[in-house]
């Protein structure tokens, strides 16, 4: 989602609290939010990009560099990044209508991007943040585990963040480690290796420090 008024480009990685952020940014963006039904028969918040008129869920860095090259380098690009184990459990439970199914999830992960996940962008967050050269072209990253920090990021730019206490679309209430049993932990580690290597995430949630973290 882009805001010319606030000179921001938000890269919405799936299952990182993005629906809430899009609602907050909506008054400052020419993009149009749409309530649609996707192929999993779940309600999802898509947007119509104002410039291309494309109906799109998760435009990546590559999308904005291609279609907004005139402003891309001058705007602040930001994203929320989530622990891969936590994110994939949340993602798969959302796809399965909130139900945990270890055997089914193992099958999905075995299929990787040839099955229910469409692309590497679905399984590895860094793929949404890199350009065609493989460079991670983002200015600010906020950890999902520190989601409320987005309030300070927005407030510094004059954006009303009062909706931030109502993060939407959450499907699992227990800690992700309670689900990562019977091989799931190791399977997610293998499938999400790009994220784990790039961000330095460990299973317990720690990640390496970088100047990009807000």
Q: Language model features by range: what are they?
A:
Residues 1-214:
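Membrane-interface amphipathic segments in extracytoplasmic regions
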